[in-house]
Amino acid sequence: MSGQPKRLMVMAGGTGGHVFPGLAVAHHLMAQGWQVRWLGTADRMEADLVPKHGINIEFIRISGLRGKGVKALLAAPLRIFNAWRQARAIMKRFKPDVVLGMGGYVSGPGGLAAWSLGIPVVLHEQNGIAGLTNKWLAKIATTVMQAFPGAFPNAEVVGNPVRTDVLALPLPQTRLVSRDGPIRVLVVGGSQGARVLNQTLPQVAARLGDAVTIWHQSGKGAQHTVEQAYAEAGQPQHKVTEFIDDMAAAYAWADVVVCRSGALTVSEIAAAGLPAIFVPFQHKDRQQYWNALPLENAGAAKILEQPQFTAEAVADTLAGWSRDTLLTMAERARAVSILDATERVASEVIRVART
């Protein structure tokens, strides 16, 4: 086996926050000659996205258990067992030297299958609070890493793997020091948008007038409604798009970002070196709050939880930040970011792989 390329199976799915960091590590190792195969589910985003990146994907049938009712919970052991058997059969065929769990429902049965076959299991937790699947898998994993401190008490903090075009952006001092004119506000709600952002930011624009210029990513199907809201607020000049294909270019344009605080978003904003107003998605474990807290503690961001996220609060916050303040915050964001997360995760995969 010594002359043959090493084999990695990445287990990740469901959301971009799981899939994109996995892709970053996969590409890094493929450039070193590794063979990579992906384990996912056929009805989530990875089914289309991963093959576009030149990686073969295998599917198992598994879904989440939250909010499914008593019947689904009673059936869960059988479903998990079947998914475990499917994952085990796939791994017997591919024979990975190591598996990398990046989150999503697929990681549970996939990690158990690898463990049962004696394959090393590397886990990476993207969020500030560990998900249920990773909490279980951490007990059997060879190595556990985390993006933010606090998800696991003794795991190494390695950051989140971030896209190379974001890492390649000029430093905040280079981008921002000579800017003048209206503050450039980038509003990002994710691919599905965020209703609270779509409803609130047109009112913020009305309060701030010519002091800001806004680029607002509304999410699928919301562009016309949000454009109309800006027009009705007397602020039709602001740019609204459903999606932003080139996030690095958007970050380069912005002076400040207003957004949810998903793990990958927070990590990208820190790596780009941008101040932010975060409005965490309201979830019972406050996962997005804990993702954003390190940047707020560093003086690089402000968290406004959804009940406090009013047009008045956002407008007052933006109006209170001078260009010098924004530059200082941007430099603090960049200073706390972990820029070599991809290399750190990949190095651990290499270290624990079967010889």
Swiss-Prot record:
Keyword Glycosyltransferase tagged: yes
Pathway(s) the chain acts in: Cell wall biogenesis; peptidoglycan biosynthesis
Pfam families given in the database record: Glyco_tran_28_C, Glyco_transf_28
GO biological process: carbohydrate metabolic process; cell division; cell wall organization; lipid glycosylation; peptidoglycan biosynthetic process; regulation of cell shape
Reaction catalyzed: di-trans,octa-cis-undecaprenyl diphospho-N-acetyl-alpha-D-muramoyl-L-alanyl-D-glutamyl-meso-2,6-diaminopimeloyl-D-alanyl-D-alanine + UDP-N-acetyl-alpha-D-glucosamine = di-trans,octa-cis-undecaprenyl diphospho-[N-acetyl-alpha-D-glucosaminyl-(1->4)]-N-acetyl-alpha-D-muramoyl-L-alanyl-D-glutamyl-meso-2,6-diaminopimeloyl-D-alanyl-D-alanine + UDP + H(+)
Keyword Transferase listed: yes
EC number: 2.4.1.227
One Gene Ontology molecular-function label: UDP-N-acetyl-D-glucosamine:N-acetylmuramoyl-L-alanyl-D-glutamyl-meso-2,6-diaminopimelyl-D-alanyl-D-alanine-diphosphoundecaprenol 4-beta-N-acetylglucosaminlytransferase activity
Keyword vocabulary terms for this entry: Cell cycle, Cell division, Cell inner membrane, Cell membrane, Cell shape, Cell wall biogenesis/degradation, Glycosyltransferase, Membrane, Peptidoglycan synthesis, Transferase
Cell compartment(s), UniProt: Cell inner membrane
Topology term for the membrane: Peripheral membrane protein
Ligand binding (UDP-N-acetyl-alpha-D-glucosamine): 15-17, 127, 163, 191, 244, 263-268, 288
UniProt cross-references to InterPro entries, sorted A to Z: GlcNAc_MurG, Glyco_trans_28_C, GlycoTrans_28_N
A GO cellular component annotation in the UniProt record: plasma membrane
Function text: Cell wall formation. Catalyzes the transfer of a GlcNAc subunit on undecaprenyl-pyrophosphoryl-MurNAc-pentapeptide (lipid intermediate I) to form undecaprenyl-pyrophosphoryl-MurNAc-(pentapeptide)GlcNAc (lipid intermediate II).
PANTHER family xrefs: GLYCOSYLTRANSFERASE, UDP-N-ACETYLGLUCOSAMINE--N-ACETYLMURAMYL-(PENTAPEPTIDE) PYROPHOSPHORYL-UNDECAPRENOL N-ACETYLGLUCOSAMINE TRANSFERASE 1
Family per similarity comment: Belongs to the glycosyltransferase 28 family. MurG subfamily.
NCBIfam families for this protein: murG
Protein name, as recorded: UDP-N-acetylglucosamine--N-acetylmuramyl-(pentapeptide) pyrophosphoryl-undecaprenol N-acetylglucosamine transferase
